[in-house]
Amino acid sequence: MRALQAGGRTVFIDFTADWCKWCKKMKRETYTDPDVMRYMSENMSVTMIDTEEVPSLARKYNVNSLPTLWFLDADGSPLTAVPGYLGPEKLLRIMEFISTKAYEEGDY
């Protein structure tokens, strides 16, 4: 996780699994969206974690359903978890809210 924290960016973790149909839909529809791809590459340190391969991290972050997205600040402190499928527009709004620290001024 330390490697993800480099650069002062928000850390974006997608907890996923090969058997998860909503994870596959998100990968196919959301993560291929040009605006999502651009925003992630410019503002986030992104990783995908297969819960079957690294169950200890899923337990650490209390992942009970898939997909679950976790956002951490640049120091690695947890900010929030977002469970469930998100389409491109919804994910963009959430990423912008978190990476700009708008949460410090009000609720989403």
Model region roles, listed by residue range:
Residues Q5-A6, R38-S41, Y61-S65:
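Extracellular/periplasmic catalytic domains that process cell-envelope and extracellular macromolecules
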Residues G7-V11, E42-T47, A74-P78, L92:
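Loop/turn elements at helix/coil->beta-strand transitions in domains of secreted/extracellular proteins
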Residues D50-E52:
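Conserved acidic residues
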